[in-house]
């Protein structure tokens, strides 16, 4: 049985990686989330980092948001070009999994060709 998790090599893990994407990434707003996208420098694999502030809600709400986003990204990852993405919530509501998957699949490739830095 295969593990249905997002592998460690598909995640942004270090602060340096998050800062690079935040500074150099193109901002793209979807209905449920805000994305920062930058083309991958070294590989064709996509990586994701998720940031959720304490303003979003209590720990169980923040953790649920992260689980939903990780799973949606895991499903669409094979169809994405090599990029690094930082995802943050918009508003305080939990995302809908199917809608979020569609948004990620649509918005990430849109943001990549124009990977110059832009404000949200």
UniProtKB/Swiss-Prot annotation:
One of its GO terms (biological process) is tRNA 5'-leader removal. One of its GO terms (cellular component) is ribonuclease P complex. It comes from the Bacteria. It catalyses: Endonucleolytic cleavage of RNA, removing 5'-extranucleotides from tRNA precursor. Its EC number is 3.1.26.5. Consists of a catalytic RNA component (M1 or rnpB) and a protein subunit. Belongs to the RnpA family. This is Ribonuclease P protein component. It comes from Chlamydia trachomatis serovar L2 (strain ATCC VR-902B / DSM 19102 / 434/Bu).
């Amino acid at each position: 049985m295969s593990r249905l998790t997002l592998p460690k090599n598909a995640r942004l893990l270090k602060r340096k990686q998050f800062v690079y994407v935040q500074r150099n990434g193109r901002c793209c707003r979807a209905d449920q989330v805000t994305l920062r996208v930058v083309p991958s420098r070294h590989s064709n694999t996509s990586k994701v980092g998720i940031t959720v502030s304490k303003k979003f809600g209590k720990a169980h709400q923040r953790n649920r948001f992260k689980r939903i986003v990780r799973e949606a990204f895991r499903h669409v990852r094979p169809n994405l070009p090599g990029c690094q993405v930082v995802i943050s919530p918009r508003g305080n509501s939990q995302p809908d999994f199917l809608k979020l998957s569609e948004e990620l699949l649509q918005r990430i490739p849109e943001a990549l060709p124009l990977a110059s830095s832009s404000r949200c």
